[in-house]
């Protein structure tokens, strides 16, 4: 059976020059999910979050041309929403507008309830799927956060809060990195390097996802060396997994791409989008929540001979400049307003650091063995069936079915570049 790991860490640094008493915090966790009553925002959130994901993707694609792209949209949305509820005036308005929300027709209370339910639903225990999202706030010992802020981040965001001595830079850096390494089960080590002085608060957001294909690949069918076209003049060799199976798929003649859905064993799916050669930018520009809904409606199940590269991908971004270009300017400026976090002035966002890691392949069960599955009854397979080879740049998405959340979004340009 196939095992996949998807890991994400987002770090925000807030800077200020303040003097106040230290505060000790305790841990709090949400243990049950309650569906908010009469909350229209809850039902709009999947579409709004998806549109934010594609807007951010397009920015990252422009800033990183011809490179692999990979990030966790839902985790970034959660972290920014958490930050917005501690902000005020234009700082809050800009953060929420970047996320796609308008406070004129969307009450803050509904947003809080919506994100609380999203986090709780994603973290709700599942039998064959490991999915855990979490947050941690590392607060300088000299900062006195408001009691309401501490209560909200625990209740709404299942957040751990740690009092931290940022005057001892190396010790603070070690404390944060150790936490991240533990929460990501050792997959992200030494996330923060060269931590600077005058950091007052750091928000860490992570997501861990591990699942098995509903129809696992056979290791013996993997081609150890197969061509993958990076561009017109560059071809690399990659292991190529191979399977003849029934998949939901669709050829979008309007967008000139082929869409294929691969289900995980429980409540999650992977969506691969293969544009025709020369049409990647066209597809990227058209990606939206409406596009996802269209594909979901038009996907048809049938036999497909599928070739998928076995690859690892990781990407690291400083989202500060990207978010500012998207309209979130005040949070990084001297005019930043965070009255919901502390009564002290001078608090502003210094950077937004994001890292995501993905491995996809047929490595096997948790013990590392990948059992062979029985042969297909060839009489069931029609003599004519489509062949889909993901042997050039393609888009990939990992979606959680219950909340319709885009957990991960990316583009594989070169599978040999991690």
UniProtKB/Swiss-Prot annotation:
It is found in: Secreted. Residues 1-20 form the signal peptide. Gene3D superfamilies: Alpha-1-antitrypsin, domain 1, Antithrombin, subunit I, domain 2, Serpins superfamily. The keyword Signal applies. Thyroxine binds at residues 296, 401. Its main location: secreted. It comes from the Eukaryota. PANTHER family: SERINE PROTEASE INHIBITOR, SERPIN (PTHR11461), THYROXINE-BINDING GLOBULIN (PTHR11461:SF375). Belongs to the serpin family. Major thyroid hormone transport protein in serum. This is Thyroxine-binding globulin. The gene is Serpina7.
């Amino acid at each position: 059976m196939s095992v996949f790991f998807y890991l994400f860490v987002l770090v925000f640094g807030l800077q200020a020059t303040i003097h106040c008493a230290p505060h000790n915090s305790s841990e709090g966790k949400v243990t049950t999910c309650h569906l908010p009553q009469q909350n229209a925002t809850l039902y709009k959130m999947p579409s709004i979050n998806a549109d934010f994901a594609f807007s951010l993707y397009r920015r990252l694609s422009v800033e990183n041309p011809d490179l692999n792209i990979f990030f966790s949209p839902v985790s970034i949305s959660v972290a920014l929403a958490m930050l917005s509820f501690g902000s005020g005036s234009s700082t809050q308005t800009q953060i929420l507008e970047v996320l796609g929300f308008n406070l004129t027709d969307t009450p803050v209370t509904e947003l809080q309830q919506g994100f609380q339910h999203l986090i709780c639903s994603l973290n709700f225990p599942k039998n064959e799927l490991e999915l855990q999202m979490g947050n941690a706030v590392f607060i300088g010992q000299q900062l006195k956060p408001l009691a309401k802020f501490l209560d909200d981040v625990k209740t709404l965001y299942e957040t751990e809060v740690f009092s931290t001595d940022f005057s001892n830079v190396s010790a603070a850096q070690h404390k944060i990195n150790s936490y991240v390494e533990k929460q990501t089960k050792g997959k992200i080590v030494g996330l923060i390097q060269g931590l600077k002085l005058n950091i007052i608060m750091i928000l860490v957001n992570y997501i861990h996802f591990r699942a098995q294909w509903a129809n696992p690949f056979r290791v013996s069918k993997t081609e150890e060396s197969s061509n993958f076209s990076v561009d017109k003049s560059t071809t690399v060799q990659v292991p190529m997994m191979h399977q003849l199976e029934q998949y939901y798929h669709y050829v979008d003649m309007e967008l000139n791409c082929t869409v294929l859905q691969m289900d995980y064993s429980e409540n999650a799916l992977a969506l691969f989008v293969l544009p025709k050669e020369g049409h990647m930018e066209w597809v990227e520009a058209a990606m939206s929540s409406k596009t996802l809904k269209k594909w979901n409606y038009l996907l048809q199940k049938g036999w497909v001979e599928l070739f998928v590269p076995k690859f690892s991908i990781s990407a690291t971004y400083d989202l500060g400049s990207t978010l500012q270009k998207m309209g979130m300017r005040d949070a990084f400026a001297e005019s930043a307003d965070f009255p919901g976090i502390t009564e002290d002035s001078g608090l502003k966002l210094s950077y937004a650091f994001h890292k995501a890691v993905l491995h996809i392949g047929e490595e096997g069960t948790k013990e590392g063995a990948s059992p062979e599955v029985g042969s297909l009854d060839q009489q069931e397979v029609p003599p004519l069936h489509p062949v889909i080879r993901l042997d050039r740049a393609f888009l990939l998405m990992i979606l959680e079915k219950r909340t319709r959340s885009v957990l991960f979004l990316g583009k594989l340009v070169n599978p040999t570049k991690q």
